[in-house]
Amino acid sequence: MIKISLGEAKKLLSYWSRGTFPTVAESVKYHFMRHGKEVSSSNVWQYLRKAEAFDKNLRGAKVYILENETSRYVKKGYYVIKDQAGKILSFGVERK
């Protein structure tokens, strides 16, 4: 059983943008299913914690400006994509 407080769950979800999905929950579910294993996350909360930790430590990351003024930050083989408001759109392993 996964233990997480309501406060932590709300905090982790607050870092994410719904992007092109109808809700933040659908965006998170999609990205966890697509990238969870590659970042060694066994559950969605672990994935969100890793995304938050990476996002908080972007010093030295290469930054690429993408469509719609979103930004891709790449560092040590991982990436995070953020929207204009600074909310996470995706997190995963950088493919070369």
Give the positions of each predicted feature.
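Acidic surface patches and DE-rich sequence motifs
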Residues: 65-66, 74-75, 83
